[in-house]
Amino acid sequence: MPESAFDPTPVTKIWQELGVPGILDVHTHFMPKPVMDKVWAYFDSAGPLIGRPWPITYRTEESQRVRTLREFGVLRFTSLIYAHKPQMAAWLNQWATQFAAQTPDCVHTATFFPEAGAIDYVREAIEAGAGVFKVHIQVGAFSPIDPLLVPVWGLLEDAAVPVVIHCGSGPAPGEFTGPEPIRVLLKQFPRLRLIIAHMGMPEYSDFLDISAQYDEVRLDTTMAFTKFSNEKAPFPESAYPRLVDLGHKILFGSDFPNIPYGYAEAVTALQVLPGVDDNWMRDVLYRNGAALFRVDS
């Protein structure tokens, strides 16, 4: 990993010149070490869910990763955990509760999986202060409209807790990925606060449509627009004007630490988007997330 990837100046210069207090990153990963080690090993193997070489830029010890984000000026971040099998989510939530308690700038994160008892540990997480959930439809290989999740979605809708959901078919499609299951889900739970990870890559236009249709559906920029992603899943030129129109619903995300480039590229890739101005950047990097997660200036 190049030392330049850890230089905060290219990142801090951007948000300072925009006149915002810092960055809110809704898509970062902190997990129990054995889980993170397995995730990194999978990336190293370029497994079928990834489909290409994927070097991890910020493969450092946990406290160093937290310190790196703070040096970049990230005021709030998440510990996006996700279960890929039954009887995993509850103990991940326990770990994330402890992590949030010792890391006050991390939004308390939780997850769930379609299984008996999911409603109970989701309720416990909300009562413990969870401010965001994460589910990964591709890795979890489950349908978001699984009947076991009906009470969970209902609870999350009523509690108005955001859910970062990886439901697009990138970097490789899964049995349950794509926009159609999300459309079905939102017909039943139209007030769900979904944050569509990776702008819904590669079904960008479909998920922009969904966000435009439902007031509480947002998108995060995670890995979108970067050179790495544009090689396989370029954002359609025809959709650029919609980024401006929906700028109030777009949140910055990075996928730190599991990115194959420096953190600064996740920010600079946004600056050069057609039609984007400084006000759009202020909204995406800070103001939209601050409003959603009730962060004081």
Model-flagged regions — what are they?
Residues M1-V26, K33-R76, L246-L251, P260-S297:
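Mid-to-C-terminal alpha-helical segments outside catalytic/metal-binding sites
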Residues P2-D7, G131-V132, F142-L251:
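Catalytic pocket-lining loop regions of alpha/beta-barrel enzymes
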Residues I23-V26, T78-L80, T109-A110, K134, ...:
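Active-site neighborhood of phospho(di)ester-bond hydrolases with catalytic His/Asp-centered motifs
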Residues H27, A96, A125, F133, ...:
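Conserved, mostly hydrophobic/aromatic
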Residues H29-P34, H84-Q87, E115-A118, G140, ...:
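Active-site environment of divalent metal-dependent phosphoester hydrolases
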Residues R59-L69, W91, P114-A125:
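Short, acidic/polar
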Residues L69, G73-M88, W95-F113, K134:
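Short, well-structured secondary-structure segments
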Residues M88-Q94, G117-D120, F142-V152:
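Active-site-adjacent beta->alpha loops and helix N-cap segments on the catalytic face
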